[in-house]
Each structure stands twice: as C-alpha cells, then as structure tokens.
Amino acid sequence: DDLVGQEHIIDILKGAVAASRTGSDSQEMTHAWVFTGPPGSGRSSAAVAFAQALICPNQGCGACNECQSAATGGHPDVEVIRTEGLSIKVEEIRELLTRVAWAPSMGGWRVVVMEDADRLTESAANALLKAIEEPGTRTVWLLCAPTLQDVLPTIRSRCRHLQLRTPSIE
C-alpha cells in the first residue's frame, strides 16, 4: 500500500517472492538488489516491503508477526541499516557482516536493507562487495540509493537494479 505508482516494481518483486518460494533457478530471484529513485519515490519502503514478503509465511501480508516485526526493525532475520552520519564506515560493515553470517533463525531468508548505500566509504563498499560476491546461503542484500551511479560499479554490476519513479500527484 505504501508503494503508490510503483506497479512495475511491485510486479517484479512479487515474481521474485514467488520464485524464492519454489526454489526456482529463474532470474526472478537474486541475492542482491539495488533500489534507486529520487527522494519520495519509496525506495526504502519498497526494500522493506520486499524483506517482509520474503520472510512472511503469507508472502507479505503486512499483518502477521513476521511482517510487523520486520517493519519495526525487531525481526531477527531482517537487518535495516540507516545512518545518521555522512558516511557508512568499514567498521560498521564488518560488524554487519559478522551479524549476518549466520543462517536465518526464523524464516527462509536473512535480509539486509541498506537505506543509504550511496554513503558507503570506498573501504566499506569494498568490504560489502566481498559479501555480495560470495553471499551467505539464504542471504539477500537490498541496497537503496538515489541513482545507480551513486553505487560502486563493482557492487552495482552484481545486483539487480530496480528504478522507482516519483509518483504523480493524482
């Protein structure tokens, strides 16, 4: 409901969730995604909704305990990274990688939503790159940035890109 005017994105994410449930080897589900779009486009909301759908037994109902705890940051298999500072430092990424190295504890996926991937320092981006190149089993990375060019080329080349639009006023 929060993704007004993003039907094209919703359809892609629904296909990915369905593929993740069946274990399909299709290209619909992948371990790393980049959500881009201007401020107000809902890129972080889309990433969190996708995380909810991946861990929800009902494919993202929004009402169950799993969805609610993912939305509020309390689900053990969903890590939402928000930064208050100007950058995300390598120490923060190394700590994150330690936390997400384990298999999911409750659901089928461990999901990391990074709201400000454009704020990664070069060394932090390189540390993250290693994790994206060699993903943990059942780990999904959801990176958010204003534009694709804001993400290190070596990272974006390993991610599926979703471009959100600014919704119309209507």
What is each stretch, according to the model?
Residues L120, P135-L152:
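Sensor-1/coupling segment of RecA-like P-loop NTPase cores
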